[in-house]
């Protein structure tokens, strides 16, 4: 993203030049969902974008994926005038999730760990131990990154961090109950199948496919999820390594 000094050095002229370059060279993906004839839609889109600067379209750049942490766990901290702390943990997953098989396994792991209201982070860290106002995990498939977000009382930072990591360790050791497994399967497959009911979710789904260079539909991914075994999810969990920890504390905390 650059630095504050680099941002301050940008001139209006340079910014406009870069803007025109982007219009001329950036790849453009147009997505349509509806009942109109595709040929008619294409004609309308071409007319609407005919005024764009015309240049050689650059391919989407490959995303840099760091498979494992480069060194010891990094810690970052900010202090603001806030009444609730934030604790965010960043993990490397051992690689990106681009194939149908790897995405299915990653989705199931995330659902078990912290991606649903039946997950370990929600039921144990938030509900049972009351260490967080909220605690959930998110998987960046194309970057190979897992992030855990939580809202924490200032006095509970250490305990919350330890318990978040303990729940990951439980997944890595295969300590996943049948109830957790079935709940995760229902959640992931249900979410994929209902993607077909919402235009916005379909657009988001296919944008991810374009970026990753794949083209399998939500129904196929749901079928793949149904074939995943618990052992395969545990293998996915075992590749995950802690990389960074960020805390937002109060100015007096």
Short names for language-model regions:
Residues 57-118:
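His/Glu-based metal-binding/catalytic segments typifying zinc-dependent metallopeptidases
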Residues 17, 62-65, 111-112, 124, ...:
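Intrinsically disordered, low-complexity segments enriched in polar/charged residues with Gly/Pro
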């Amino acid at each position: 993203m650059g630095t504050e000094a680099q941002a301050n050095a940008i001139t209006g002229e340079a910014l406009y030049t870069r803007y025109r370059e982007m219009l001329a060279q950036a790849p453009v993906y147009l997505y349509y969902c509806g009942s109109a004839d595709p040929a008619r839609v294409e004609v309308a889109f071409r007319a609407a974008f005919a005024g764009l600067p015309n240049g050689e379209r650059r391919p989407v750049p490959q995303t840099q994926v760091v498979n494992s942490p480069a060194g010891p766990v990094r810690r970052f901290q900010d202090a603001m005038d806030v009444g609730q702390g934030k604790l965010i943990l960043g993990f490397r997953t051992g690689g990106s999730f681009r194939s149908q098989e790897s995405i299915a396994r990653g989705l199931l792991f995330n659902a078990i760990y912290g991606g649903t209201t039946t997950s370990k982070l929600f039921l144990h860290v938030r509900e049972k131990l009351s260490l967080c106002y909220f605690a959930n995990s998110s998987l960046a498939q194309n970057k190979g990154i897992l992030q855990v977000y939580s809202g924490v009382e200032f006095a509970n930072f250490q305990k919350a961090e330890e318990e978040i990591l303990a729940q990951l360790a439980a997944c890595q050791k295969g300590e996943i109950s049948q109830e957790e497994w079935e709940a995760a399967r229902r959640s992931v497959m249900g979410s994929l199948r209902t993607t077909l009911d919402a235009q916005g979710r379909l657009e988001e789904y296919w944008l991810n496919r374009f970026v990753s260079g794949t083209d399998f539909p939500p129904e196929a991914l749901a079928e793949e999820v149904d074939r995943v075994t618990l052992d395969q999810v545990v293998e996915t969990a075992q590749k995950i390594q802690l990389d960074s920890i960020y805390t937002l504390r109060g100015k007096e905390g």
